[in-house]
Design a protein with these regions (language model features):
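Bacterial N-terminal signal peptides
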Residues: 18-29
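Hydrophobic small-molecule pocket/channel-lining residues, especially in calycin-type beta-barrels
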Residues: 34-177
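Bacterial N-terminal signal peptides that target proteins for export
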Residues: 2-19
Length: 177
């Protein structure tokens, strides 16, 4: 006569490795998602009709944004026009692990930034601080940019710039070339 207890033990012993493999796969997928499955790389062109520029008398938004994301590194090249109409290019190099990075800013300043992933790994926030000299006075500008993809064809950047004389919020939408 068959002992049902022995049969149950065999099923459990057979299922245990399958359960462990399943848990390993689940863990691997979770870790992969946390390591940046979202990739912001691309050549992006400003979509002015979908963007909101706030109350600024001139637009300080890049018309072209080139982004390269490789592993934990993010680099940007922004092309925009200065208030006097001259084309300006600025570059930035960041790590996406929350460590502080330093890049050249405007008016011979230095910008210190950190990049952090959101809890759901669907967006990043770049928090920056720039100290510059204007007419003999040191001023600090703080900025926060939250990047998120809308599908794979649009990059939305919500920005808040804070200076002693006020705050400016913009929403920039870029279409992928």
């Amino acid at each position: 006569m068959r002992n049902p207890q022995n049969s149950d033990k065999k099923v459990i012993n057979t299922a245990r490795p399958l359960i462990l493999v399943g848990l390993f796969i689940l863990f691997f997928v979770q870790v992969s998602a946390q390591n940046g499955t979202i990739n912001f790389s691309g050549n992006w062109v400003l979509n002015e009709s979908k963007s909101k520029f706030g109350d600024s008398p001139f637009r300080m938004a890049a018309s072209i944004l080139i982004v390269k994301q490789e592993g934990n590194n993010l680099s940007t090249e922004r092309t925009q026009n200065s208030p006097d109409g001259q084309e300006m290019k600025t570059t930035g190099k960041f790590t996406m692990d929350g460590k502080e990075c330093e890049n050249s800013g405007f008016m011979d300043s230095k910008t210190k930034s950190t990049v952090k992933w959101s809890a759901d790994n669907k967006s990043i926030t770049i928090a920056s601080s720039t100290i510059f000299n204007m007419n003999g006075d040191n001023m600090e500008m703080k900025a926060s940019e939250t990047w998120m993809l809308e599908g794979d064809k649009a990059l939305k950047i919500e920005t808040t710039n804070s200076m002693p004389d006020g705050e400016l919020k913009t929403t920039l939408v870029y279409d992928k070339k």
